[in-house]
């Protein structure tokens, strides 16, 4: 008769300081299919070590161990996990049920790692619990089950994948006599159904119920009667086999790992929430800074554009502050006409200005009077609250008309509904008000100077008596590169003047400088927020490391029922990523609340959440979970199942 399990000259020793302590010494043993064997011995005799080797939880230091003819020493860790999963079922003295799972979910664990479809394994788990008399306790957690009921759940778990070999370590040690008898009766029934049952015990009454008693003392077998071949009534229950394609097995495995991770998180809600807190704050900081910073940047750029978008100013001289008399009259009206003819020019306006007194009735105020063309307001993107700008005829006739700014209107006409047609004195010249320009808010604040605008011909001839222009402002057409336009403008005027007696000021350079400055500031603040996210990630790693330590026995149980190192790695990594993703979602919600509150207090700000910001937050959460969850997950996957099961 060929042995199902065969040990040949097996020894097992462990390092103790600089020495090796032998626990098993030259063990040779054969166990046949369908036997019920008891391994007895006092504490420290090596019987538990022998059981670990039989169950492929441990490997011998020397000698050969074969399972159904396969040499275990030739198998890698994944193959050993498969062997445990498909051939062995473990029953422990302390049951080793996972407290956050129900009875049925505990029974399903081996089938989860075997890749069995959910419906099939749920049906099998309920069938096994029904057979063991626990049909009314299927959805109960272990804390609501008696010791005997918990051990029956443990037996059902051992049978989930078929359980060809049942390894029972002191199965009645924690039970009362009645429950112990029930468990032993179940084990005998399993023996009768063709299962190979190996009981490790120090109780002679339990051992006496086995067909064969193997006694071990000080690491050596001192009594080993020959096996007795018996005919069994039935064969071993066939395990449920997974026939799904590879990609479906992977998807199922990932889904189950996600489900187990969620259950583990739900079992420690407060700790999970505190772990998430750092991620919530970090993600909220990053997202808030990105969206609020973007809103602030757009507001700054809008204010700059309000000063004149896509405009180029031309001034006489070499630079600002140059009052050399030879350059004072550099810009002429003919220059303006030549500029207006260029195909890339949208509009152009001259400018002459002087500080004057403005009077209406008994009100006398100081204003800055500007001589401009009718295109001035188009160049600077200004709209009218009342009336309109001056036309070409008024400019040609040097008409005595004026446009007021909103502040000047309030000073002169605080109680009038419409001021168009009113006559005021600019200097000593009476002029008719034809419009009120809408004031535009600026990031630099509003000037304390009151502004009025007259036709430049009126200003030059009637008030100032000069034929040259103080400056020209050009608005470039949309789509035209302002730098190229500036170069062409410089070339045009240099050719006309025969020299470069002017300088230009491109508002786009101000815009680009502001964009660069706001981007730098936003980047700096984002880096500060990322630091808080990193701190949150370190918190996740710290808690996950603690979790691995606290759940060491759970890891050992999972490995005993067939989990591979990669399964354990996947589960703990998914837990870390899930914590970070949920924390990220809450962080995004918090940032939306912050944005909502800011808009209540800062109504002018347009805060919006782009898909880019949300996708970035999602990726940050995922990356943080992977980065800071890797070390704890790797530590969990590297645990030795024997050491893990021995931890309290």
Swiss-Prot record:
Keyword Transport found: yes
Topology with respect to the bilayer: Multi-pass membrane protein
E.C. numbers: 7.6.2.-
Binding site for ATP: 41-48
Gene Ontology CC terms: plasma membrane
Transmembrane segments: 273-293, 417-437, 523-543, 577-597, 611-631
Keywords: Antibiotic resistance, ATP-binding, Cell inner membrane, Cell membrane, Membrane, Nucleotide-binding, Translocase, Transmembrane, Transmembrane helix, Transport
Biological-process GO terms, alphabetical: response to antibiotic
Chief site of localization: membrane
Domain ABC transporter: 5-243
Signal peptide: none
GO molecular function, one term: ATP binding
Locations listed in the record: Cell inner membrane
InterPro entries: AAA+_ATPase, ABC3_permease_C, ABC_transporter-like_ATP-bd, ABC_transporter-like_CS, MacB-like_ATP-bd, MacB_PCD, Macrolide_Exporter_MacB, P-loop_NTPase
Highest rank taxon of the organism: Bacteria
PROSITE patterns documented for this protein: ABC_TRANSPORTER_1, ABC_TRANSPORTER_2, MACB
Known role: Part of the tripartite efflux system MacAB-TolC. MacB is a non-canonical ABC transporter that contains transmembrane domains (TMD), which form a pore in the inner membrane, and an ATP-binding domain (NBD), which is responsible for energy generation. Confers resistance against macrolides.
Subunit field text: Homodimer. Part of the tripartite efflux system MacAB-TolC, which is composed of an inner membrane transporter, MacB, a periplasmic membrane fusion protein, MacA, and an outer membrane component, TolC. The complex forms a large protein conduit and can translocate molecules across both the inner and outer membranes. Interacts with MacA.
Family, as annotated: Belongs to the ABC transporter superfamily. Macrolide exporter (TC 3.A.1.122) family.
Name of this chain's protein: Macrolide export ATP-binding/permease protein MacB
Source species of the chain: Salmonella typhi
């Amino acid at each position: 008769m060929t042995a199902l399990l065969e040990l040949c000259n097996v020894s097992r020793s462990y390092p103790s300081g600089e020495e090796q302590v032998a626990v098993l010494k030259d063990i040779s043993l054969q166990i046949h299919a369908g036997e019920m064997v008891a391994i007895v011995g006092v504490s420290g005799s090596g019987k538990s070590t022998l059981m670990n080797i039989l169950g492929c939880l441990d490997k011998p230091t020397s000698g050969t161990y074969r399972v159904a003819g396969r040499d275990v020493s030739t198998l890698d860790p994944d193959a050993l996990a498969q062997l445990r999963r498909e051939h062995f079922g473990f029953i422990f003295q302390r049951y080793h049920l996972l407290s956050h799972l129900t009875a049925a979910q505990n029974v399903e664990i081996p089938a989860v790692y075997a890749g069995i479809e959910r419906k099939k394994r749920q049906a099998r788990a309920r069938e096994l619990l029904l057979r063991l008399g626990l049909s009314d306790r299927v959805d109960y957690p272990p804390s609501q089950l008696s010791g005997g009921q918990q051990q029956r759940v443990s037996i059902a778990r051992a049978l989930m994948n078929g359980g060809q070999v049942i390894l029972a370590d002191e199965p009645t040690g924690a039970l009362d006599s009645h429950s112990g008898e029930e468990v032993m009766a179940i084990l005998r029934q399993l023996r009768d159904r063709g299962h190979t049952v190996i009981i490790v015990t120090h109780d002679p009454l339990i051992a006496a119920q086995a067909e064969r008693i193997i006694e071990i003392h000080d690491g050596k077998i001192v009594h080993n009667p020959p096996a007795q071949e018996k005919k069994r009534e039935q064969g071993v229950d066939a395990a449920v086999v997974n026939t799904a394609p590879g990609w479906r097995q992977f998807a199922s495995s990932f889904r189950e790992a996600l489900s187990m991770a969620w259950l583990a998180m739900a079992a420690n809600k407060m700790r999970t929430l505190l772990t998430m807190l750092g991620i919530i704050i970090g993600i909220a900081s990053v997202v808030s800074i990105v969206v609020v910073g973007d809103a602030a940047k757009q507001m700054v750029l809008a204010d700059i554009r309000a000063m004149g978008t896509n405009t180029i100013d031309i001034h006489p001289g070499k630079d600002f502050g140059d009052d050399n008399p030879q350059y004072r009259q550099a810009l002429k009206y003919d220059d303006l006409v030549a500029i207006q003819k260029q195909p890339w020019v949208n509009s152009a306006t001259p400018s002459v200005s002087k500080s004057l007194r403005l009077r209406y009735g008994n009100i006398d105020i100081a204003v800055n009077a500007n001589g401009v063309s009718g295109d001035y307001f188009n160049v600077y993107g200004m709209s009218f609250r009342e009336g309109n700008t001056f036309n070409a005829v008024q400019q040609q006739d040097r008409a005595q008309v004026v446009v007021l700014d909103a502040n000047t209107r309030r000073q002169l006409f605080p109680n009038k509904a419409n001021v168009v047609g009113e006559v005021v004195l600019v200097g000593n010249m009476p002029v008719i008000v034809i419009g009120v320009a809408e004031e535009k808010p600026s990031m630099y604040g509003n000037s304390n100077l009151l502004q009025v605008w007259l036709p430049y011909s009126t200003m030059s001839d009637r008030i100032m008596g000069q034929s040259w222009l103080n400056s020209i402002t050009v608005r470039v057409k949309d789509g035209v590169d302002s730098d190229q336009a500036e170069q062409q403008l410089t070339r045009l005027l240099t050719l006309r003047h025969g020299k470069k007696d002017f300088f230009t000021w491109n508002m786009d350079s101000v815009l680009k400088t502001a964009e660069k400055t706001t981007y730098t500031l936003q980047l700096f603040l984002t880096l500060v927020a990322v630091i808080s996210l990193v701190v949150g990630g370190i918190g996740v790693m710290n808690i996950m490391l603690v979790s691995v330590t606290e759940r060491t026995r759970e890891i050992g149980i999972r490995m005993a029922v067939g989990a591979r190192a990669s399964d354990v790695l996947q589960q703990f990594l998914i837990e870390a990523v899930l914590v970070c993703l949920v924390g990220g979602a809450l962080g995004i919600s918090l940032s939306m609340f912050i944005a909502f509150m800011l808009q209540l207090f800062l109504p002018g700000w347009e805060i919006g959440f782009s898909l880019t910001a949300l996708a970035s937050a999602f990726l940050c959460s995922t990356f943080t979970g992977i980065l800071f969850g890797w070390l704890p997950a790797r530590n969990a996957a590297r645990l030795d199942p024997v050491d893990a099961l021995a931890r309290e």
